[in-house]
Regions:
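Glycine-rich, phosphate-binding/catalytic loops in enzymes
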Residues: 5, 17, 94-96
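Short, well-ordered beta-strand segments in beta-rich or mixed alpha/beta enzyme
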Residues: 25-33, 62-91, 129
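Hydrophobic h-region of N-terminal signal peptides that target proteins for export
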Residues: 10-18
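N-terminal targeting signals for Sec/Tat export/insertion, comprising classic cleavable signal peptides
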Residues: 26-56
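Glycine-rich beta-strand-turn "strand-cap" elements at beta-sheet edges
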Residues: 4-5, 20-27, 64-71, 100-131
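Alpha-helix boundary/capping residues
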Residues: 11, 46-49, 94, 103-106, ...
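An amphipathic, aromatic/His-enriched active-site/gating alpha helix that lines ligand/cofactor pockets
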Residues: 21, 52-62, 80-115
Length: 131
């Protein structure tokens, strides 16, 4: 779990840093807990909306779902949008509305903290290593 959290944090910070010129970028790490009896169904909804959003929406930079290794009902989704406008547009799409309405009763807890990079200069190095 610690490695998963570190990887997610580094990804959030590095992508945010790479887009430093775009001060309006929105980065969130959704923290979701799902009722166990709905887990499989929830994961199906989440995977569909994440895939369709990244494929179809230019303003959706990243939707990266992860599942806790210790507790499979705990889901984290790294969300990165090009701007507040892109985020607001995403909320209005059919795939997101289907996900949101279809999973309301499945979600035990939801937090959507907005993230910001701790050290944008150092995080830029991650992209250089990936090339």
């Amino acid at each position: 779990m610690r490695q998963l959290a570190m990887t997610a944090a580094m990804l959030v910070l590095s992508i945010t840093a790479a887009a430093q010129e775009n001060e309006t970028m929105i980065v969130r790490l959704a923290e979701i807990e799902v009722y166990p009896q709905y887990l499989k169904e929830y994961l199906d909804y989440a995977n569909e909306v994440d895939r369709l959003s990244v494929e179809r929406e230019p303003g959706v930079v990243c939707l990266y779902p992860m599942q806790s290794a210790e507790d499979s009902t705990k889901i984290r989704i790294l969300e990165i949008y090009a701007s507040e406008e892109a985020y607001q547009q995403h909320l209005k799409t059919d795939p997101f509305q289907k996900y949101k309405q279809g999973t309301l009763h499945m979600v035990k807890d939801l937090k959507l903290p907005t993230m910001k990079p701790l050290d944008p200069e150092t995080m830029k190095l991650i992209f250089k290593k990936q090339r």
